[in-house]
Amino acid sequence: SAAEPTCDTIVSAGTVKVLTDQGWTFEEKEFVVGGVTLADGLLCFWADYSVASDHGQLYGWSTISAEDAASAQSSLLAEGWTREDGPDGIYITENPQFAMGTDEDGYGMTYLFGDGWVKFADTRQGLILIEWAG
């Protein structure tokens, strides 16, 4: 059977090493996309839990049906998120005015919807680190 995704396998081994070398660990959260709860999904919040801080990194991955993907996308767009079509799927990005943090291209939290899956990171560049293919 295919391996189940876990917080230390959905992102690249190099990413896990960098984060754990910093003393960071992860907590698994419920992965909810535009009001759609993805029971098979995984949302991972990496942080240094030995200090009181909201500084961390979020990575998510899940399988998703076409119906759920359409519903999640329309819900996010209705909340003011923006859509960009890319070669690898549909990017849905939060309004940068409300972003906690952005990458050097100005993108904050971003979902990438592919064929039967969705990825999430707290910046669009962060999506590159999610290597899980399901």
Q: What are these language model-derived features?
A:
Residues 1-48, 134:
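Extracytoplasmic low-complexity, Pro/Thr/Ser/Ala/Gly-rich segments
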Residues 43-57, 64, 107-117:
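Long, continuous compositionally biased terminal/linker segments
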Residues 48-92:
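Long, charged/polar, surface-exposed segments that mediate recognition or autoinhibition
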Residues 87, 92-134:
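Extracellularly exposed regions in secreted/surface proteins, prominently low-complexity, repeat-rich
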Residues 3, 30-31, 69, 96-99, ...:
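Intrinsically disordered, low-complexity segments enriched in polar/charged residues with Gly/Pro
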Residues 42-43, 77-82, 104-109:
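Short small/polar-residue motifs
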